[in-house]
């Protein structure tokens, strides 16, 4: 049976199931701690049969842990499928491979890390005309990260500002005048991990090594205290391998179209 993590005991069980799992403990744990007691936030958190937990926001779902095997597992997968359909979730990230009728596997995301206490060689510094801002205004950052979607930019702005206001993570930006042209941040963290995300360069400034320098700079800074991790699509794997990050695993990625079913 799918249970909402709506009590302190169920939220504690949700966090216990995440227990130091790369990517999931930092991401799902941060979101639960920030938004788990605020249903109007748009985030929702559930305990599933077996060792699984589920996070939902809009049309996106994240599954960590495993459903039971055998007939019980078949029933649990069918319940999950119906639940996702009812809530119109059409993308799913999962810790383990998952077979759900009507869901198509996409290329897995690659999970990378810089272990705690390690540093990477710093790429060449950006041009002198750019200024590093360690506490940038998040509104223009949100528009740099999601230039084509006001809704996604607003969601990112809300989540990032909430995290930063609660002392979770950091944002870095390179400014040209007052305009951010490159950014990367950490908006999710666990006691063992800082999760980096939203690394973006303005198209007009690409090809100048800005992201290389900014990503490595922040990763080296964060790795002084915790292991740094992030996920990327397959086409960016060569980029991060060249910088010296270690690939440690994959995150399964699925999608569906309920209009065709």
Say what each PLM segment does:
Residues 71-83, 197, 201-203, 207-221, ...:
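Conserved acetyl-CoA-binding loop-helix of GNAT-fold acetyltransferases
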